[in-house]
Amino acid sequence: MELKATTLGKRLAQHPYDRAVILNAGIKVSGDRHEYLIPFNQLLAIHCKRGLVWGELEFVLPDEKVVRLHGTEWGETQRFYHHLDAHWRRWSGEMSEIASGVLRQQLDLIATRTGENKWLTREQTSGVQQQIRQAMSALPLPVNRLEEFDNCREAWRKCQAWLKDIESARLQHNQAYTEAMLTEYADFFRQVESSPLNPAQARAVVNGEHSLLVLAGAGSGKTSVLVARAGWLLARGEASPEQILLLAFGRKAAEEMDERIRERLHTEDITARTFHALALHIIQQGSKKVPIVSKLENDTAARHELFIAEWRKQCSEKKAQAKGWRQWLTEEMQWSVPEGNFWDDEKLQRRLASRLDRWVSLMRMHGGAQAEMIASAPEEIRDLFSKRIKLMAPLLKAWKGALKAENAVDFSGLIHQAIVILEKGRFISPWKHILVDEFQDISPQRAALLAALRKQNSQTTLFAVGDDWQEIYRFSGAQMSLTTAFHENFGEGDRCDLDTTYRFNSRIGEVANRFIQQNPGQLKKPLNSLTNGDEKAVTLLDESQLDALLDKLSGYAKPEERILILARYHHMRPASLEKAATRWPKLQIDFMTIHASKGQQADYVIIVGLQEGSDGFPAAARESIMEEALLPPVEDFPDAEERRLMYVALTRARHRVWALFNKENPSPFVEILKNLDVPVARKP
């Protein structure tokens, strides 16, 4: 059927379209120079209007577009409109049945996802969202018309509501799922560890996000959560033991974790590994070679001897090397260097040996060629760093030569090799769930190993337990932003905070938490104590009062109670401890550096050495160009890592902390603690 404008109407209307033809599933409007095809699946409405003389048809399209036909005889226009409208509505009715079926399928998909007795991840909801949107884009009717049809209206509204508030729907589902699991598995959460898990711990265990950061403050039971998570995956049938990878940072920590798992989960099939042990396993399986880790890695004295021998050789044989080293040590390091053959000076050798060891280690950790190291250094130090790298190159070469002679690899080489094997597909990861302890200590190199493992299977979950407040190993390559910007680095997911400490009282917690959170770069989290503490739970005391303090402690400390004396450096060990065995024989006193105390706890803690200066705490920044270029950037907040060290020291104690300071030259931390209402005592 066709409708045409009258001759006069066409002339007066001066419109591009003067005729319309009904097609099988659409309408064509045209003129002498223009033609427009309107498929029914784009048509939103048809309006028939009467002007002063002629009729007019309007075809409403998406995006507020309207196509008009003018100048038609009114009676003809009405007949054409009724015929077209009936045809369009018949077609629309048929298409609504198809659309209704598609919409019902989307509701079934939503019901399946939300009805499953499983955690609904962000990735899954994103997938459903994408699938629904794709289905909507493939409907035979414009979505703007779905409200018109009884068979589509309700389903369409439900789909829209779910798409509009998808995050709320996900949270609601997961909250209901979590509550159901905590009830159904109440016995498991009560018995999996020596003490029942608290609600925050249990919720972290149940959380099924693919990338989950569990922030575990000092004494909040992180090991319990890791053990319970492994047990939960087994109990729910979500993984077999060989599909669970448990990673710890040190051999001792891995052994302790193994013991806990055997004791609590009654299985020997889940084994905690260090990152190096994991890399070794990947290399063995992926290359059928059994790499030997160099003996030098565990022999500090032998490493120092190797580096000093090569350093002396370079300086004695090459004038340019000797000149470069003298300049480096005097100008940048500001050391006193003897005249003449300074490389033969034993005191200088002893002082430099640990530095050379550290710098070679940083170069190995970077793993790149000299040009790559130089290119990745900050621009403002690149030229100077380039000179330093050239001085260090022979030492790196000597290290590689020693490894070759031993037919061995070093720790950095292990992880590099493992990443290459994973990227080439020579080892296929069997692990569906990766659980990592002390995640705040992770370095970019170890993060790359995790990424390479997860890349092989996008469904591999990462359950990372750590505490950015206790990140104190930047000198070993730890990069705090891998924790504080966890989801940017490891994919979208959740964060769970373990909000209760079982170690220290509320007063120690209040002081330590306020002290660390003065740095806005640290993640904010709650950490509540189960016991109250009085104002004296943290006390500032003159360092001359150490003997008097130990005298007093000897009067009331029980034989089983531990006293931990902590210092920034080994050489700050108090002289009083030389007589401790005879003067305070009943006191259980241990001394260690704050770094070494990580993971330890005691009834009473005495922090010594709160003074300013070269051996002070906070330690003055003494980084060379090598550290500046090869380690993660230093944080903007003053003494950020030293503050975290102080936090670690404060939170080793169950009952009381004494911070001993130098009255003549006090540490800046003393004033900060005073401002946190920590009292200064004249005597213990």
Task: List the predicted regions and their residue ranges.
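Accessory C-terminal helicase-associated subdomains
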Residues: 386-389, 393, 533, 543-588, ...
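Conserved helicase NTPase motor core
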Residues: 127, 136, 140-153, 160-218, ...
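Anionic N-terminal interaction surfaces
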Residues: 1-19
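P-loop NTPase Walker
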Residues: 23, 33, 37, 44-52, ...
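A basic/glycine-biased coupling hinge at the interface between accessory DNA-binding modules
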Residues: 143-170, 174-176, 182, 234-408
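Conserved helicase C-terminal RecA-like lobe
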Residues: 433, 558-560, 587-588, 598-663, ...
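Conserved RecA-like helicase ATPase core segment
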Residues: 444-535, 677-681
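Helicase P-loop NTPase motor core
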Residues: 213, 220-226, 492-494, 500-587, ...
